[in-house]
Amino acid sequence: DLPFEDWVHQFPTFTRTNALFSTNMDINASQYDLALQESGWFDTSMPDINLDNPFLLQYFKLWAVWWIEWADLDGLRVDTYPYNEKQPMSEWCEALLAEYPNLNIVGECWTADIPQLAYWQGGNLNKDGFDTHLPSIMDFPLRDAMCAALSTDSVKWDAGMIRIYNTVADDFVYHD
């Protein structure tokens, strides 16, 4: 039995996330799409935890502290970071960084859209005022550019190695 009925998000039948994490930053997003993105399960064997439950959020903080202490960790990788409720995740990052100022937390925010990726980096000047407190994000746009550049011999202005250059030149949208 779950400690609380709302420990995980539950629907009458299995409901998968819509994977539209752009709804987190879209002031015009439908509440339906946002709720499905945050609350839908990633897969049948991967329930979506409900970090809006304050007891679960506290457990999640203590769980991270235990692992950091037990394994002497310098950093954490958070899979599918934007699929969680963003406010509790921000509180989680903030709490861990208050306890461990030199800890690095990297969020997997798998998108090729650079402005949407930048939204998730802590300290970014997001228009909605939201701060994730997430120190690091995985640079999937650079990964995609490198894969594309290294798989062609093209010297056209929009292909090959220039893809890497242009992606790195877009670093101005990131906080740090």
PLM region descriptions:
Residues T44, H175-D176:
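Sequence-level motif detector for i,i+2 pairs with an aromatic at +2
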Residues D1-W70, E91-E99, N104, P115-Q116, ...:
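Substrate-binding/active-site clefts of carbohydrate-active enzymes
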Residues W63-G75, T80-H175:
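Active-site-proximal helices and loops of the catalytic beta/alpha 8
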